[in-house]
Amino acid sequence: MRTGPGAQRPVGGVRSGPDVKQQLTADEATFVEKHVRETHLRAPSADLDRYAEKDRWIIKPSGGYNAVGVLAGLDCSLSAWEKRLRLGAQNHDVIQAYAPQYATPTLRGGTAAHEDPTASVLANNREGLYLFDGKVGGVFTRCGQAHTIGEFTGRLNMGCFVVHE
C-alpha cells in the first residue's frame, strides 16, 4: 500500500465496503483510514441525515471530471445544502469529509491596469504531491477564494517545483 496520484473519490467510495475490508490486512486498513478521506457514494435510497452538519462535508459529481457541481457545505445555506444533497443522491454523487484549508495572502497576478499588482487577496490553499514511479517528483498548490477550489470557482494555480536527487 502506498499513496499515489489517483483521485481519492473512486478509492474512498469503496474503502469502507465489506469486499475491500476482507482484502486488506489490519495494517493496510489502518493506512487507508489515515490517508483517504471518509467518502460515500450516494444512491436515491440513501439516508442523508448523517450529512446534516453541512460544514463537515463536500459533495461532488461521481464522474471523473468534477469541477462543475462541487459544493462545500461551508459555501452555502442549509436549504441549498439539503437541496444539493437530494440531487446528489439521485445522481449517485460522492460525499466526502471536508478537508479544511488554510488561508494566506496571495498575489493574484494578471491585474487590470488600474489595480495595484502588489495588492494581495486572501486565498484558501490546497497542496498536493506529484508522484512518479513511487517517488515524489514535485509539489503543486491550488488556491481560491471559496471553500471549493475548482476551475469555475476562481481557482489560481500556483507554480510547482520538481525535486531532483
Q: How does the language model describe each region?
A:
Residues 68-165:
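ATP-dependent carboxylate/phosphate-activation module, predominantly the ATP-grasp catalytic core
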Residues 1-104, 108:
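Active-site nucleotide/adenylate-binding loops and adjacent lid/helix of ATP-dependent enzymes
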